[in-house]
Design a protein with these regions (language model features):
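C-terminal helix/juxtamembrane-tail motif
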Residues: 223-224, 228-267, 323-325
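Nucleic-acid nuclease catalytic cores
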Residues: 105, 109-130, 138-241, 245
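Short interface patches used for recognition in eukaryotic signaling and trafficking proteins
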Residues: 81-87, 175-179, 214-216, 284-290, ...
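Alpha-helical interaction elements in eukaryotic regulators
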Residues: 94-97, 186-189, 223, 227, ...
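Charged, glycine-rich intrinsically disordered N-terminal tails and low-complexity linkers that flank
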Residues: 1-107, 156-180, 248-249
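Eukaryotic beta-rich interaction modules
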Residues: 95, 99, 110-116, 275-276, ...
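PHD-type zinc finger and closely related Cys/His-rich zinc-binding mini-domains in nuclear regulators
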Residues: 258-325
Length: 325
């Protein structure tokens, strides 16, 4: 029987983890990015923030070379510089966002209880994990989770409430009604949080200097069942193989993937992420591979190295389309 040995957890894949073990690991990692053990337990696990990227790789039948940057991130070989302006801003604003959310919840709900959490590991699939920003419960709604986002949006002098002029890419506006884009990575992230924590709703809360936006999103079992199939396949195809032969780790070089220290700055506006590796699209980088290109159809940005763009390709084409388009 195949075994999983992952950060001190060992046993047949079919056995899973006990409820007691899941709770102990959660308690031991409260504080999340301020807790070293949280980082340790994430390594080698597909966390909910990567669910969308993993699913896209499987559905689009990507080659191992294209999967490599994402796999490297999941295994903990590479990471994004936490001091990048957008990420630093998000960390600094999260306590304020949390306070604003809690005030809103207390006004419209009874017996509200908030609880900080660490990492939740799927008891049946210990290679899946999620870290909601907050665990929430109340007498009227039962048990849920909350996820906070703090995008860097400039102050708007035209809008008196949540700014519609510079809407974050993860929100959609349909006849004046805002909602989370169901095709965005954040939707997969919170569906994963609900599935792994065993809760049935998530308050998606967006904090900006122009006001706040909140949407309660319910668990979608059909969506998650489909997503989970992709996650299982990715684990069996790539992560198990990497644990066995360490081919990605052994092939590591200094410039692939790019060292984040070559970054001079990140654009002061919206921060874009490469759909393939989920890495940040950076400005003013020194190496050609670290540069990026925008698809002329879907308008998403991709790292040159992730889509195999060469100087010849750029010279010969007036337009460029990503593999999906």
């Amino acid at each position: 029987m195949q075994k999983l040995i992952l950060n001190g957890l060992e046993g047949p894949l079919s056995d899973g983890l006990s409820t007691e073990t899941v709770e102990k690991l959660n308690d031991a990692t409260v504080g999340q990015n301020r807790n070293e053990q949280w980082y340790v337990l994430r390594k080698g696990r597909i966390t909910s923030s990567n669910f969308h990227s993993v699913s896209c790789k499987i559905k689009h039948n990507k080659s191992k070379d294209v999967v490599r940057p994402l796999l490297s991130n999941i295994m903990g070989y590479t990471s994004v510089n936490p001091n990048l302006k957008a990420l630093k801003y998000g960390r600094e604003m999260e306590p304020i966002a949390k306070e604003s959310y809690q005030l809103c919840m207390k006004k419209g709900h009874t017996n509200v209880v908030f609880k900080n959490c660490g990492i939740f590991i799927d008891s049946c699939r210990p290679y899946l994990a999620a870290s909601p920003d907050l665990i929430v419960s109340c007498s009227c709604c039962g048990d849920g989770v909350s996820e906070f986002k703090c995008p860097m949006i400039p102050k708007c002098d035209l809008c008196t409430d949540f700014c519609l002029c510079k809407l974050p890419v993860f929100l959609r506006n349909e006849d004046g009604i805002l909602s989370l884009n169901r095709n965005h990575a954040y939707f997969a992230q919170i569906q994963g949080q609900m599935a792994i924590t065993g809760r049935f709703w998530c308050d998606f809360f967006v904090y900006t200097c122009n006001g706040n936006f909140s949407e309660r999103i319910e668990f979608d079992k059909d969506y998650y069942d489909d997503l989970q199939c992709d996650l299982d396949r990715f684990f069996n195809l790539y992560i198990l193989a990497e644990f066995k032969n360490r081919s990605v780790e052994n092939s590591f070089t200094e410039d692939e993937p790019m060292d984040v220290d070559v970054v001079k700055n990140v654009n002061d506006g919206n921060v874009f992420f490469c759909p393939i590796c989920k890495g940040i699209i950076l400005d003013d980088v020194k190496t050609f591979k670290a540069q990026s290109v925008q698809c002329d159809k879907c308008h998403l940005w991709f790292h040159f190295s992730c889509v195999h763009v060469t100087k010849t390709v750029l010279k010969d084409k007036k337009e460029w389309f990503c593999p999906h388009c």
